[in-house]
């Protein structure tokens, strides 16, 4: 008993989380306090997050494009061209706002952006990351929910209302904000030929978006919708708002290919089958006429002068997405297994196989979670009922669904046993 009490007296504890020296890997001693490695790591994460939210400013007090791009790099893998376009656009937006109060002969117009890229290439993630790091009001809207005024659905003014809410109803701040409209390709005109039926969720929405994207004084109901007819409307000027629109534009690559260089004939012709060029490579050749054929009206295309295309994610990029970001999928599943007291290990060959399966599905990064779920489903089903499992190893054969994962047991059971 005396030995136990003396041991407990000699045991050191973290002054922050209270864990003992036996529960952590490292305990660092100060003059009168101790801190464990887990608390140090947590403090570093907090410092990094605060550093990212305070971007380096240029001479005019405007975030530099390189600094914005660097922060985007921490969250989004690849897509350097799209990051470059977004960084410059946001930088110029800040500059316009910084100089808008000065009396200048030249009025700088805003350059709204259209992001075009295959599904799962990172369009929405880029916008979400911008929202995290910017110090101007930012809102995201879904174009699929919008309808023309007078029909069931959301009015375009609701987008301005969301921005107003993001600015805590400060109209001055909201007027200098950034709006991201996702799934913009879903409001394309349903047919090249005018129809006798009204297209309230397609061309009608494009027409309604024109004025707020160009710059107008919108009347916004503070409580939203039409349920409160007696409410007073807020007047919001959209002239200084930056609009970023994004969409997958499924089928646009076929329109571009059809317009393209045509079918070459003769010995010197450069003949390439459509399958040889990936969707992202074809989308790089997009022209306004292609967007017109897709179903966007000319006036709407004119409001989006900057078009940035995103690439298909290759094998190396998908492997980085699996492992590199702070919330990478491998880290997420490793944490789930850690809750069971088990270490989860993926071999390099296994990660490569997961990336190849995602490429074959043509779903980009979005398909990675479904593949990981299918690989780990049986293991996650069996593991809570197993005892003394130290580690689960996922190799190439497991990733190809040829064999079951390898279970590494503790001392009580043989390590070579597998399920």
UniProtKB/Swiss-Prot annotation:
Membrane-spanning parts: none
Binding annotation for Zn(2+): 14, 17, 36, 39
Top-rank taxon: Bacteria
Domain ClpX-type ZB intervals: 2-55
Function, in words: ATP-dependent specificity component of the Clp protease. It directs the protease to specific substrates. Can perform chaperone functions in the absence of ClpP.
Binding site for ATP: 118-125
InterPro entries in the record: AAA+_ATPase, ATP-dep_Clp_protease_ClpX, ATPase_AAA_core, Clp_ATPase_C, Clp_protease_ATP-bd_su_ClpX, ClpX_bact, P-loop_NTPase, Znf_CppX_C4
Molecular function via GO: ATP binding; ATP hydrolysis activity; ATP-dependent protein folding chaperone; protein dimerization activity; unfolded protein binding; zinc ion binding
Family assignment from sequence similarity: Belongs to the ClpX chaperone family.
SMART domains recorded: AAA, ClpB_D2-small, zf-C4_ClpX
Protein's UniProt keywords contain Glycoprotein: no
Keywords of the record: ATP-binding, Chaperone, Metal-binding, Nucleotide-binding, Zinc
The keyword Repressor is annotated on this UniProt entry: no
NCBIfam families the UniProt entry points to: clpX, PRK05342.1
Originating gene: clpX
Self-association and partners: Component of the ClpX-ClpP complex. Forms a hexameric ring that, in the presence of ATP, binds to fourteen ClpP subunits assembled into a disk-like structure with a central cavity, resembling the structure of eukaryotic proteasomes.
GO biological process: cell division; proteolysis involved in protein catabolic process
Cellular compartments per GO CC: HslUV protease complex
Gene3D superfamilies: 1.10.8.60, ClpX chaperone, C4-type zinc finger domain, P-loop containing nucleotide triphosphate hydrolases
Protein name per UniProt: ATP-dependent Clp protease ATP-binding subunit ClpX
HAMAP family attached to this UniProt entry: ClpX
């Amino acid at each position: 008993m005396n030995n136990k009490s003396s041991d407990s007296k000699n045991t050191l504890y973290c002054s922050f989380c209270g864990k003992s020296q036996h529960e952590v890997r490292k305990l660092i001693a100060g003059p009168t306090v101790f801190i464990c490695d887990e608390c140090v790591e947590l403090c570093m994460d907090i410092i990094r997050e605060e550093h990212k939210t305070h971007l380096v400013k240029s001479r005019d007090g405007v975030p530099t494009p390189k600094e914005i791009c660097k922060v985007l790099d921490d969250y989004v893998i690849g897509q350097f061209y799209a990051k470059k376009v977004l960084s410059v656009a946001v930088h110029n937006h800040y500059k316009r706002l910084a100089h808008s109060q000065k009396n200048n002969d030249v009025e700088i117009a805003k350059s709204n952006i259209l992001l075009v890229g295959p599904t799962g290439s990172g369009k929405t993630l880029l916008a979400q990351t911008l929202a995290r790091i910017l110090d101007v009001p930012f809102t995201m809207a879904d174009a699929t929910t919008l309808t023309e005024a007078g029909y069931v659905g959301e009015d375009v003014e609701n987008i301005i209302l969301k921005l107003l809410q993001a600015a805590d109803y400060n109209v001055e701040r909201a007027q200098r904000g950034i709006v991201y409209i996702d799934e913009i390709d879903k409001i394309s005109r349903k047919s090249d030929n005018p129809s006798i039926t009204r297209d309230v969720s397609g061309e009608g929405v494009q027409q309604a978006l024109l004025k707020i994207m160009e710059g107008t004084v919108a009347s916004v109901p503070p409580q939203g919708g039409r349920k409160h007819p007696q409410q007073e409307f807020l007047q919001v000027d959209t002239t200084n708002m930056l609009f970023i629109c994004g969409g997958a534009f499924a089928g646009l690559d076929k329109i571009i290919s059809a317009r393209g260089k045509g079918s070459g004939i003769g010995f010197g012709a450069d003949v390439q089958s459509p399958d040889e060029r990936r969707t992202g490579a074809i989308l790089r050749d997009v022209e306004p006429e292609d967007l017109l054929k897709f179903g966007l009206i000319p006036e709407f295309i004119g409001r989006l002068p900057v078009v940035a295309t995103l690439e298909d994610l290759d094998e190396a990029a998908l492997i980085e997405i699996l492992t590199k970001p702070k919330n990478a999928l491998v880290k997420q599943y490793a944490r789930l297994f850690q809750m069971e007291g088990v270490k989860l290990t993926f071999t390099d060959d296994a990660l490569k196989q997961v990336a190849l399966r995602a490429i074959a599905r043509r779903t980009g990064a979005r398909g990675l979670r479904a593949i990981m779920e299918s690989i780990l489903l049986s293991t996650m089903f069996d593991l809570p009922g197993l005892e003394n499992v130290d580690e689960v190893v996922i190799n190439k054969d497991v990733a190809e669904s040829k064999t079951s994962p390898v279970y590494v047991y503790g001392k009580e059971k043989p390590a070579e046993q597998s399920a």
